[in-house]
Regions:
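A detector for short, charged/polar N-terminal pre-domain segments
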Residues: 1-8
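A basic, amphipathic helix-loop patch mediating RNA/tRNA/ribosome contacts
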Residues: 10-53
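C-terminal structural segments of small proteins and small subunits
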Residues: 44-71
């Protein structure tokens, strides 16, 4: 599982772009609307959901843990 360091809280759509899973905001929106994204094992349909450190985001076989930066 990857660990991606971001400033928390971060929106789900922005996290998908930072992680390289979505190439654009529109692509992130499409992934979320299609139900392809999970947060902590549960399907998530809100692109603007705020993620916190420790949350696990999944798309298909890919999973990553949200890690908070110190600054």
């Amino acid at each position: 599982m990857d660990e991606i360091v971001v400033r928390c809280p971060v929106a789900l759509g922005a996290f998908l772009k930072i992680a390289g899973v979505a190439s654009t905001g529109g692509h992130a929106k499409l992934l979320v609307q299609e139900g392809a994204v999970t947060v902590n094992g549960q399907p998530e349909t809100r692109r603007g959901r705020k993620l916190a450190a420790g949350d696990v985001v999944g798309v298909g076989e890919w999973e990553s843990r949200v890690c908070s930066s110190a600054t």
